[in-house]
Amino acid sequence: MVERARRLGRWFLALDSLLVILGFFVVMPMISLRFVDQQGWAAGIVGLALGLRQLTQQGLGVLGGSLADKFGARPLIVGGMLLRAAGFASLAYAQSGLELILSCIISGLGGCLFDPPRAALVIKFTRPRQRGRYISLLMMLESAGAVVGALLGSWLLNFDFEYVCLLGAGLFVCAALCNLLILPPYKLSQRPTPIRAGLGQVLADKAFCRLVLILSGYYALWVQVMLIFPILVKQMAGTTTAVGWMYTLETAISLTLLYPLARYGEKHFKLENRLMAGVLLMTTGIGLVAFATTLPAVFVLLACFYLGIVIAEPARETLMTKLAQPGARGSYMGFSRLGLALGGMTGYVGGGALHDYANAQGQPWLPWLVLGTVGVTTLLLLVNCFHREPSLARVNI
């Protein structure tokens, strides 16, 4: 691929990511507020619905990636985004737990189609030395989109949840049209790869599979920004607007620190050390919420948590792209989402159930201590994994 095509591809992917993240954050953080806080549903039910969405999207991501290896990126991306739009639109009319679960699963099916090929396009449009920086820039752009989306969603939630869902659906329809009309029919692999062959190549890479599974603990922490963090902040502040403050804080940290930290980290630290440092900060931030009694204290710990994500996520994504084999990029990037599937499902369901149990028992600190323990366990497993598998660290050379 010529450099001009790579450069145009990077610009398109950046703008496309902004539309996708706007559509996602308009809707997703509002689901727990709508059904738990406003409607009085059990957090466990809402967590189950969100977890099944995560499990569907990321658990089937390896299938979406394999299909993209065979048929190319564009048809999977366009079809997946339209399916996501349908799922978000149906959320507006969910009146029971079953309807909420079905809407979330439809949304997840859309994601399992468009997410792996988009991740594989990052590999196609970047050279290895510039990939980490480009991923960091994408994360900065996505953070800005997240805060705008969350602020829009929290504002529209004051009027009607239907407006929230229809705006999110509309943004995904726009993204689908842009991909249909602008994105060339790129192939992701060096040659069309049979689905079974791509899957087999990934499953034979034991070190990669082990790392992906360990990272499910990282994601169990990460998804709490969609579930119990918004509930806690809203309850302590007394207004849904405070949820927007959460994402404003995240954006401020991302825009000011993400790129400089990523550049500094590239020069001075290995990818695995950056990843583990980020998990340590996330664990500290989420575990100490158990002892926070004021909203400012919660926001200080949120800042620590977000800083951990800012350090860990570029390193994690860069590590995944470097470990992906050229003959099965879509399959590798799809399988890399399995950790998010398992961790997201566990985090959503476990977080929601712990929230309900803690409220019933008068022990509001319990979910945060349990999540802190998950973080410590994940960190220890990562240390052991990188020690046992030097090949995972060798990609830094």
From Swiss-Prot:
Q: Name one GO cellular component term.
A: plasma membrane
Pfam families under this entry?
MFS_1
Stored CDD domains: MFS_MdtH_MDR_like
Q: Does the keyword Transmembrane helix apply?
A: yes
Q: Which Gene3D superfamilies match?
A: MFS general substrate transporter like domains
UniProt keyword annotations, A-Z:
Cell inner membrane, Cell membrane, Membrane, Transmembrane, Transmembrane helix, Transport
Record's SUPFAM superfamilies?
MFS general substrate transporter
Principal subcellular localization: membrane
Family, as annotated? Belongs to the major facilitator superfamily. DHA1 family. MdtH (TC 2.A.1.2.21) subfamily.
This protein's name: Multidrug resistance protein MdtH
Q: Can you name the source organism? A: Aeromonas salmonicida (strain A449)
> What is the phylogenetic placement of the source species in the record?
Bacteria, Pseudomonadati, Pseudomonadota, Gammaproteobacteria, Aeromonadales
**Which gene produces this protein?**
mdtH
